[in-house]
């Protein structure tokens, strides 16, 4: 049996197969916030009825070859149009009237909410601000080519900074209410360090130096029997894009050792700023915590065995405890069980230590999920120890009352 394979995408792209067999995609690449994105479908169709013809394809005249290729392209286009109609129908089912619809990448395979620091930042912010929302994992980028983006009352906003400004204006929430002018200035400066500098060092570790592990975590739909091939293609395309964008940024012009040195300086700066405080700016939550958590969580849970993971779970243990506090407080369905933080569900035995898939609520509201937060916590777990032999919970990790959230109402 012979198979025909095609790639269908609504975004223009050019495939460059040069002498070194590199592959480059252009046209859908847009900006520093979430550069790695891939949208389209791998479509396969059987050609079993034309086995004899396909066997003799090499000797057929050019017009027959053209006919076969055109037929395959038409089949791919028809399948893609059907997919688009289904997507449109699904989108029509999403009612954004007085509801926040968060568009983001699909959940990865390792139980972490997102491999994207910006998607994790945005979803964590919505939970911190106690704003009910609905996830949509369609994979489609915003009009500006960004991910994540939201819909609210038929308005579409992309870019996490603009999304937060929009929600503050429309819904009156403000996680920075307790910050003074000086603290707000410090918060913005740290945000830019994390998103415009530390982010690129993480991207290098995730999509260049640790690509094979990242590929295992990547979740793709629509690939069918070609899922593994599609995952490999997406990861290597992303690797090339990240390296090219890092070079344009300037940080990619340094050696691997120098990039990791810059990463370590950023992480040490965050650890020094946090100190023994509960949150980055003090005892109260702020928008900065969503930003920092979205990025540190990548080092904590998506980069096994790498330098940033060893650093955060070893020497900079206060950052690990900070991540655990936020994870346990705002992500009750996120149970991560690796060598350092083991959380077992009430139904599971001590021997079962497998990744628990993320549970996606159709609509998430913290007031519904954390109704017993003041009492003994039902999802507290038994921790393991870090690389130094200290428990990740040697510091304050208990759950707060809702006083943390009164500031954003």
Curated annotation (Swiss-Prot):
It comes from Mus musculus. Belongs to the FAX family. Keywords: Membrane, Transmembrane, Transmembrane helix. Residues 372-393 are annotated as: Disordered. The gene is Faxc. It is found in: Membrane. Its main location: membrane. It holds the Pfam family GST_C_6. The chain crosses the membrane at residues 68-88. PANTHER family: FAILED AXON CONNECTIONS HOMOLOG, METAXIN RELATED. GO terms for cellular component: membrane. InterPro entries: FAX/IsoI-like (IPR026928), FAXC_N (IPR045796), Glutathione-S-Trfase_C_sf (IPR036282), Glutathione_S-Trfase (IPR040079), Metaxin_GST (IPR033468), Mito_Protein_Transport_Metaxin (IPR050931), Thioredoxin-like_fold (IPR012336), Thioredoxin-like_sf (IPR036249). SUPFAM superfamilies: GST C-terminal domain-like, Thioredoxin-like. It is a single-pass membrane protein. May play a role in axonal development. This is Failed axon connections homolog.
């Amino acid at each position: 049996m012979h198979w025909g394979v095609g790639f269908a995408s609504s975004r223009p792209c050019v495939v460059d197969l040069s002498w070194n067999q590199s592959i480059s995609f252009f046209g859908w690449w847009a900006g520093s916030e979430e550069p790695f994105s891939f949208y389209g479908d791998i479509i396969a169709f059987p050609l079993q009825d034309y086995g004899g013809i396909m066997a003799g394809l090499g000797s057929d005249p050019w017009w027959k070859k053209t006919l076969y290729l055109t037929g395959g392209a038409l089949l791919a286009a028809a399948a893609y149009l059907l997919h688009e109609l289904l997507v449109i129908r699904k989108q029509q089912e999403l009612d954004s009237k007085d509801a926040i619809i968060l568009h983001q990448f699909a959940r990865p395979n390792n139980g972490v909410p997102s491999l994207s620091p910006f998607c994790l930042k945005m979803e964590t912010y919505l939970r911190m601000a106690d704003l009910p929302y609905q996830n949509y994992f369609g994979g489609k980028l915003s009009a500006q080519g960004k991910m994540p983006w939201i819909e609210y009352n038929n308005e579409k906003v992309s870019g996490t900074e603009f999304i937060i400004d929009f929600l503050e204006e429309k819904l009156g929430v403000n996680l920075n209410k307790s910050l003074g002018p000086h603290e707000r200035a410090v918060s913005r400066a740290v945000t830019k360090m994390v998103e415009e500098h530390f982010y690129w060092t993480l991207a290098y570790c995730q999509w260049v130096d640790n690509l094979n592990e990242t590929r295992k975590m990547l979740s793709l739909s629509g690939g069918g029997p070609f899922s593994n091939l599609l995952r490999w293609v997406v990861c290597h395309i992303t690797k090339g894009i990240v390296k090219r964008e890092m070079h344009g940024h300037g940080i990619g012009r340094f050696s691997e050792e120098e990039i990791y040195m810059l990463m370590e300086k950023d992480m040490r700066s965050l650890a020094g700023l946090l100190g023994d405080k509960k949150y980055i700016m003090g005892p109260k939550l702020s928008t900065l915590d969503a930003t920092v958590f979205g990025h540190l969580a990548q080092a904590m849970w998506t980069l096994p065995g790498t330098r940033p993971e060893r650093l955060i779970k070893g020497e900079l243990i206060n950052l690990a405890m900070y991540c655990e506090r936020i994870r346990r407080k705002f992500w009750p369905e996120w149970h991560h069980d690796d060598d350092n933080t083991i959380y077992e569900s009430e139904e599971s035995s001590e021997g079962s230590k497998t990744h628990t898939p993320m549970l996606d609520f159709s609509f998430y509201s913290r007031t519904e999920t954390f109704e017993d937060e003041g009492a003994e916590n039902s999802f507290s777990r038994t921790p393991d120890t870090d690389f130094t032999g200290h428990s990740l919970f040697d510091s304050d990790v208990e759950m707060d009352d809702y006083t943390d959230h009164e500031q954003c109402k």
